Structures are given as C-alpha cells and as structure tokens.
Amino acid sequence: VEVDAHGRRVHVIVVHLGLIPGSRVRQVDRLQQFIEREVPPGSPVVVAGDFNDWGAQIKRMLSGFGLYEFDAPRAFTYPARLPLVQLDHVYVRGLEPLGLHVPRGRIWWRMSDHLPLIAEFKL
C-alpha cells in the first residue's frame, strides 16, 4: 500500500513468512522482485510483519537489497504472554528510524500469539 505521509509517498508492505526455511527464502526472493517492479528506486519502503526467522538469514537477504532493521535492542514479541524471541521485525529503506515499542499487557496477548510492534520514523 502507498501511504501519504506529510505529502511524501511511503510504500508499506506487510508479510507473514512461512515456517520452512526454504519457503522463506523463496518468499523473500519474490518480495525483492515485487519491490523492484512496483516501488520506484529511492522511494521510502517499510516491510513489517512476522518473518518467522530464528536466525539471521532473512536479515542478510533483505539488507542485500537495501532494507535495514532498527539498530536498537531486540524487541521480543513471541510468544505474547511471555515474549522470549523476536520473530516480528520492521525493515526500512529511505526512512530514519526513531523508535520501536512493544506494548505489553493482557489486552495485547489476548489478541494474538504475537505482540505488536509500533515503529516511528522520520521522513
């Protein structure tokens, strides 16, 4: 989706990658093809969601085509009741990350098995 942020277009893509490592690699390859085809070069992009990646393979792939994660302490989001790992991420291109927040509390872990991530950027 394209979002108008103070007169500037930001492309936002939400993902939920598969559980099988090979499947995730193929999905990220398709994501790259989609971005190259649909998003103008140099335009700001946000890719966020459940990457289901317990390692760093997907992060390396995304950085290979210019998407970078917040350089901040890990934001544990899974499982929601007692978050121990970070499977949910926000990757960006062309935006300055300002903050990343994980809301806590019963209302949040009742909605999903993952806690949400709230990200703030500077254009």
Language-model features and meaning:
Residues 1-123:
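Active-site regions of metal-assisted phosphoester/phosphodiester hydrolases
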